[in-house]
Amino acid sequence: MDNYVTGTAIRTLRVSVPELLSGEQVINVNRAANLRRSRLYVCPVCGNVLHAAGSAMISCCGVTLPPLEAEQPDEAHDVRIEDIEHELYISSAHPMNKSHYLSFAACCTDDRFELVRFYPEGNAEARFFRRGHGILYWYCNRHGLFFKRF
């Protein structure tokens, strides 16, 4: 495709280059930026964790990343949430070895998004200041994203 034509099409259609080439337009329906509607992305190549307040076309290491779909946890991936003096303390008995571990936990309310990164051979524990009701997300490097409302 000619650069002039590409540039003209991008300006006229108001889309990004990846949107133009893929034929899929990304429309952010979360104009109010309610952070409970956040999208999380994880790069399968380098492990980067990316957060967007709404729909976005995200790429890392040359790969276009799909938004993660959060699931209800099974028994092996459940976390314990304790409410201790204005804080949520979360912990998990999930394996934390180099090949299978929890990568992060994120606490999301209407106006705040806080992420704590975990590392292999470390502890899967985090503290978040409690700011009302929200959603807790956590990510297993093998089985994906899980959530629990609080």
Report the location of each language-model feature.
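Exposed aromatic-hydrophobic patches
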Residues: 89-92, 124-132
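Cysteine-rich micro-motifs
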Residues: 54-65
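Short, flexible, mixed-charge glycine/proline-rich loop motifs
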Residues: 30-37, 49-53, 130-131
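Short cysteine-rich clusters marking metal-coordination/redox-active sites
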Residues: 43-46, 60, 140
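Residues immediately within or flanking Cys/His clusters that coordinate Zn2+
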Residues: 40, 57, 137
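DNA major-groove recognition helix of helix-turn-helix/homeodomain DNA-binding modules
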Residues: 4-19
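Cys/His-rich microdomains that often coordinate metals
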Residues: 49-50, 64-65, 144
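Edge beta-strands of extracellular beta-sandwich domains
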Residues: 142-150
